[in-house]
Amino acid sequence: MQIVEQMKDKALAELNLVKDKKTLDDIRVKYLGKKGELTEMMKLIATLPNDEKPKLGQAVNIAKQALQEAINLKLANFEEQELNEKLAQEKIDITLSGVGQNQGSLHPVTKTLNRIEAFFKQNGFAIEFGPEIESDYYNFETLNIPSHHPARAMHDTFYIDETHVLRTHTSGVQIRTMEKQQPPIRIIAPGRVYRCDSDITHTPMFHQVEGLLVDKDVSFADLKGLLHAFLNSFFEKDLKVRFRPSYFPFTEPSAEADIECVMCDGKGCRVCKHTGWLEVLGCGMVHPKVLKAGNIDSEKYQGFAFGMGVERLSMLRYGIDDLRMFFENDLRFLKQF
């Protein structure tokens, strides 16, 4: 038994001097391998008297267990050390400046459309869409625009053929909605529209949002209240709003809504032409002939409609002075939004 204890102490002493995994494995083989010294001691059990066999077997097992635990602990220390060295070599220097990433954003026109749609959806309006190539019937006839009306002139409209045009407004969506749905009706119709015009304030294609509400006992006061609330929400300030009498063939009475200039707070500047007011949208009570074209009883129901140019509202909200910048794909401009 004393020999086993001495062998264990010797092995543990050698383990304390080990500096690498290879030497550690050599010691393991030397004492615990198939021909290791402690393994050979087990073979001596057969030569001992019966009363001595259990004592030697127990002593050898205790020695082997102690040695194995010491080897495992040493091995774990080596592996932890190797891992720490590897992590130190692969460490990322977080003090270095990061690599810049280009981050996309929504186009200002899209942002404006989303803002308009959000307000009207919150107020119970549905969103309806229609074809961009529109028939003469829906683009003009049903909107009380007869064949001799100036809006039909070639300099205003892109004609596809004698009976189809690139729509000049989204008002045709209103008629299509009235044909398939009885009041109450609350819709807005956003989309692209086309007109033969191109300068600093006009482009051949632009975006428009038109709205329609048809129900019983609808008045111009309802229209004014809704649009005033919309303009305050869109520009995020309490604006002065005025409604000027105007003319549109599809509404009667008709008006244009002006807001106090957001650039100069009504004091007068180049943007508002020193009037202190900016025109932002057109509106009015739906003409009885238009209701009739949509199969709505004008004696029973009334309605109001309104329309606004999305690019114009974008220009006013973001302080943009040239409409054409929206369509030039200049990243220096677009990155500002």
Swiss-Prot record:
Binding-site positions, Mg(2+): 252
GO biological process: phenylalanyl-tRNA aminoacylation
Cellular localization per UniProt: Cytoplasm
Transmembrane segments: none
Source organism superkingdom: Bacteria
Keywords recorded for this protein, A-Z: Aminoacyl-tRNA synthetase, ATP-binding, Cytoplasm, Ligase, Magnesium, Metal-binding, Nucleotide-binding, Protein biosynthesis
Cellular component, GO annotation: cytoplasm
Cofactor(s) the protein needs: Mg(2+)
Gene Ontology MF terms in the entry: ATP binding; magnesium ion binding; phenylalanine-tRNA ligase activity; tRNA binding
Enzyme Commission number: 6.1.1.20
Catalytic activity line of the entry: tRNA(Phe) + L-phenylalanine + ATP = L-phenylalanyl-tRNA(Phe) + AMP + diphosphate + H(+)
InterPro entries in the cross-refs: aa-tRNA-synth_II, aa-tRNA-synth_II/BPL/LPL, Phe-tRNA-synth_IIc_asu, Phe-tRNA_ligase_II_N, Phe_tRNA_ligase_alpha1_bac, Phenylalanyl-tRNA_Synthase, tRNA-bd_arm
Cofactor binding description: Binds 2 magnesium ions per tetramer.
Subunit structure as annotated in this protein's UniProt entry: Tetramer of two alpha and two beta subunits.
Assigned protein family: Belongs to the class-II aminoacyl-tRNA synthetase family. Phe-tRNA synthetase alpha subunit type 1 subfamily.
PANTHER family: PHENYLALANINE--TRNA LIGASE, MITOCHONDRIAL (PTHR11538:SF41), PHENYLALANYL-TRNA SYNTHETASE (PTHR11538)
Protein name according to UniProt: Phenylalanine--tRNA ligase alpha subunit
Organism, scientific name: Francisella tularensis subsp. tularensis (strain SCHU S4 / Schu 4)
Gene: pheS
